[in-house]
Amino acid sequence: MAGRGGRALLALCGALAACGWLLGAEAQEPGAPAAGMRRRRRLQQEDGISFEYHRYPELREALVSVWLQCTAISRIYTVGRSFEGRELLVIELSDNPGVHEPGEPEFKYIGNMHGNEAVGRELLIFLAQYLRNEYQKGNETIVNLIHSTRIHIMPSLNPDGFEKAASQPGELKDWFVGRSNAQGIDLNRNFPDLDRIVYVNEKEGGPNNHLLKNMKKIVDQNTKLAPETKAVIHWIMDIPFVLSANLHGGDLVANYPYDETRSGSAHEYSSSPDDAIFQSLARAYSSFNPAMSNPNRPPCRKNDDDSSFVDGTTNGGAWYSVPGGMQDFNYLSSNCFEITVELSCEKFPPEETLKTYWEDNKNSLISYLEQIHRGVKGFVRDLQGNPIANATISVEGIDHDVTSAKDGDYWRLLIPGNYKLTASAPGYLAITKKVAVPYSPAVGVDFELESFSERKEEEKEELMEWWKMMSETLNF
């Protein structure tokens, strides 16, 4: 027993050392209180979930606490730093954290893009705590999700803005203070405007996806992009995300692409090629939120125009046009489908309401996460079984393609129906397959592509066989 206990202690010490930069964060935090001081915890934890606002040091503490209690299925990493130097922290939950497992889809939640929209930040901390708790209890739904999905949770994309907003006196925070990053940049207007490119391509012909392919260097050199924006762009391009949601505040609705209107008007329904699945994804969130899906809910503010809202969902352009948003950037630069969820009429509501927001959104957060296992999935390989990366998977009738990841794995979100899928890659013969797609789970469809060189060799052998047969027949 002593030996086993010693090994456990060594493991714990190693874990603590590995995250020392996290545990010692408060001393490094700009404007942090003196070492050893902690803000008074006003609310009690319930089942391991702390229903309170977490300042930057406390956010770190909360994530580290989750990790230390389930190191086998989690890790903490950072995608970069904010303008003021705070780390953009992510907690990952997976049965093999830190590794992309071939065939396993990647999911992300992002909160607090606008620093004064605080509910999403807290809900994502609560979600990480909830997933840990339920996994340890053996909750079958949660265990299956963590074993079949690589889940990335970023509670705050704008920690500088949150600290500014949280420092405002009183319970009611200003509607705008802390919205932007420390440079005064609205992060949800700061992404490359790929909508304008795809709208031109729709008319003149051109690619309908991966519009920033091989352009990381250009992104890094763009002085108009905030450091937070650049960090997320790299994140999106480095990991083969399939599904994502961006959590905001100020209304109650699940918003789907396109966010920017085609004509440039302020309000115009702007459908993407995947309008049907995006509507379904948005409803998968809103339908489990009683306040969001209530058709008789009055507008958040007296003069708000909610006429575009249907069952707690809206097309982005129909609500109001947003150029340079992160939602459309995901869809047009990568394989990732993202919606934007507005969680609360108040942007920074009183702390004692956080538990109610969690109860209203818990099932929605899980339901939306489960949507990643819809549609079609599989591998693209050559005839020798080698993976083909960056193969194109197109769906007849939907003018938006996805591509395979480095292991040849791909995922294509679709609503139920009958489809024709075509896999193609440079130097290979394309293959088309018919597939019937249920609501869930995703149907497995693999493709084996024959290279042109293999086909030429095969045709050469067939010609030689034909010549041999003709020679024998005619006694040449």
UniProtKB/Swiss-Prot annotation:
Membrane spanning stretches: none
GO molecular function: metallocarboxypeptidase activity; zinc ion binding
Membrane topology, as annotated: Peripheral membrane protein
Keywords: Carboxypeptidase, Cleavage on pair of basic residues, Cytoplasmic vesicle, Glycoprotein, Hydrolase, Membrane, Metal-binding, Metalloprotease, Protease, Secreted, Signal, Zinc, Zymogen
CDD domains associated with the record: M14_CPE (cd03865), Peptidase_M14NE-CP-C_like (cd11308)
Cofactor(s) this protein requires: Zn(2+)
E.C. number: 3.4.17.10
Compartments, as annotated in UniProt: Cytoplasmic vesicle, Secretory vesicle; Cytoplasmic vesicle, Secretory vesicle membrane; Secreted
Active site positions: E342
Reactions performed catalytically: Release of C-terminal arginine or lysine residues from polypeptides
GO cellular component: extracellular space; transport vesicle membrane
Gene Ontology biological process: peptide metabolic process; protein processing
Chain residues in the propeptide: 26-42
Signal peptide: 1-25
Enzyme class: hydrolase
Subunit structure comment from the entry: Interacts with secretogranin III/SCG3.
Family, similarity comment: Belongs to the peptidase M14 family.
Protein name in the entry: Carboxypeptidase E
